[in-house]
From Swiss-Prot:
Keywords: Cell membrane, Disulfide bond, G-protein coupled receptor, Glycoprotein, Membrane, Olfaction, Receptor, Sensory transduction, Transducer, Transmembrane, Transmembrane helix. This is Olfactory receptor 56B2. It is a multi-pass membrane protein. It comes from Homo sapiens (Human). Belongs to the G-protein coupled receptor 1 family. The lineage of its organism: Eukaryota, Metazoa, Chordata, Craniata, Vertebrata. It comes from the Eukaryota. Disulfide bonds join 104-196. Odorant receptor. The chain crosses the membrane at residues 33-53, 62-82, 107-127, 147-167, 204-224, 245-265, 280-300. CDD domains: 7tmA_OR56-like. InterPro entries: GPCR_Rhodpsn, GPCR_Rhodpsn_7TM, Olfact_rcpt, OR51/52/56-like.
């Protein structure tokens, strides 16, 4: 509704009525071959995360804060993958490259929100692991159901209010005649690069949001795991230390991939490297690989989730 009102009140600014998503730059002639692996990743992401939600919902033993966080991560994964993959597959299969301005800005906002939701959920999970390992006796009194809902409610409010500025500022730019985006989704930089007026405010806003949201999240995650590592190194029992590190390993692998790709994309964009395919491909993979990998990594590492999976699939 906000975007529609803004679109109507500023209709004179738009000389184009739609954008054209060109797909993967530099490989237009054979990019359709990417559709099969991308479709398989999307189906895997959907089925695996829906299965995680079913398991957590059905198994009373999994009605605990740690699994609530995992369920929230699964919902973010489903939302992120579904925001981009249907349109990408439509481009690759049916050459359906056009997207209205409103749809483009809505997709831009949804992508930012779901990525931020994943980031903030990783923060909550890192804090959960810190309390479980470093303050085990106080865990039941600190990490309660109330804490889970308050923490995620605060993060959702923070993300939605901060990130609404991204599509609003993009919608205020003047788009004169060029409407072809060398991308397969409506990225902020890809869209605003088509504007024929000063877009510095968009770039500044993007940098500020990256530092305040992603930067603060990453800082809290690093602090949490640094404190965990410090506590583990002080343990006298090698078995207990090994168990604690094993619990955190899967978290760290996924977090490392999540933030490393974001940093690489930012570097290639900010330095103006003449490799447009790389940031576009990384952007797409970053939005579909974690949703596919997250449930598998956590399910394989967690005994309770595996048992719940066997029950749901009637394997025991």
């Amino acid at each position: 509704m906000v975007l529609q009102e803004l679109r109507d009140s500023n209709s004179s600014k738009f000389q184009v009525s739609e954008f054209i998503l060109m797909g993967f730059p530099g490989i237009h002639s054979w990019q359709h071959w990417l559709s099969l692996p991308l479709a398989l990743l999307y189906l895997l992401a959907l089925s695996a995360n829906i299965l995680i939600l079913i398991i957590i919902n059905k198994e009373a033993a999994l009605h605990q804060p740690m699994y609530y966080f995992l369920g929230i991560l699964a919902m973010a994964d489903i939302g992120l993958a579904t925001t981009i993959m249907p349109k990408i597959l439509a481009i690759l299969w049916f050459n359906a490259k056009t997207i209205s301005l409103l749809e483009c800005f809505a997709q831009m906002y949804a992508i930012h929100c779901f990525v931020a939701m994943e980031s903030s959920t990783f923060v909550c999970m890192a804090i959960d692991r810190y309390v479980a390992i470093c303050r085990p006796l106080r865990y039941p009194s600190i990490i309660t159901e109330s804490f889970v809902f308050k923490a995620n409610g605060f993060m959702a409010l923070r993300n939605s209010l901060c990130l609404i500025s991204v599509p609003l500022l993009a919608a205020q730019r003047h788009y004169c005649s060029q409407n072809q985006i060398e991308h397969c989704l409506c990225s902020n930089l890809g869209v605003t690069s088509l504007s024929c007026d000063d877009r510095r405010i968009n770039s500044i806003n993007q940098v500020l949001l990256a530092w305040t949201l992603m930067g603060s999240d990453l800082g809290l995650i690093i602090l949490s795991y640094a404190l965990i590592l410090y506590s583990v190194l002080k343990l006298n029992s090698p078995e207990a230390a090994s168990k604690a590190l094993s619990t955190c390993t899967s978290h760290l692998i996924l977090i490392l991939f999540f933030y490393t790709v974001i940093i690489v994309i930012s570097i290639t964009r900010s330095t103006g490297m003449r490799v447009p395919l790389i940031p576009v491909l990384l952007n797409v993979l970053h939005n579909v690989i974690p949703p596919a990998l997250n449930p598998m990594v956590y399910a394989l590492k967690n005994k309770e989730l595996r048992q719940g999976l066997y029950k749901v699939l009637r394997l025991e």
